[in-house]
């Protein structure tokens, strides 16, 4: 985002210094507590997600180097492949993840980790909780994700995504 009231930097070095100053200022003045009610739930290709930290959407927090989101798995997530480097803490429920064809069961209190590996990790998450959706928090350290050339390839969308967006799957 460009602030038209500010003077453009004279060169790349000055632009880098200005960027560092903005990062430091955001660390001093950005939100320390992100309230649940301040972030909306969204229906995405992966399912129902609420982002708490996401620099692409929210520049109001003291930390910008992390992508942190809560996901609710009602039946199953979308299937996709990307570089790993993701830690997922299970908040409620139980289920399993199929990663590169192998099943990994999880439940409340577990930590699911997707490794960084050549070619990425193909995975999909499933809820087996008969009492309702499973829910977790996912943590992605963005500098690492960018360094390993993060790329997401969607293989299947979560149930209900097309209907939520008014799309037709034909």
Regions inferred by a protein language model and the residue ranges of each:
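Residue-level detector of conserved, well-ordered beta-strand and adjacent loop positions
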Residues: 72, 91, 107, 115, ...
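Short, conserved beta-strand element in jelly-roll/cupin
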Residues: 68-73, 81-97, 139-141
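Short acidic-glycine-tyrosine-enriched beta hairpin
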Residues: 100-120
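A short, N-terminal "cap"/entry segment at the start of jelly-roll beta-barrel domains
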Residues: 1-62, 149-170
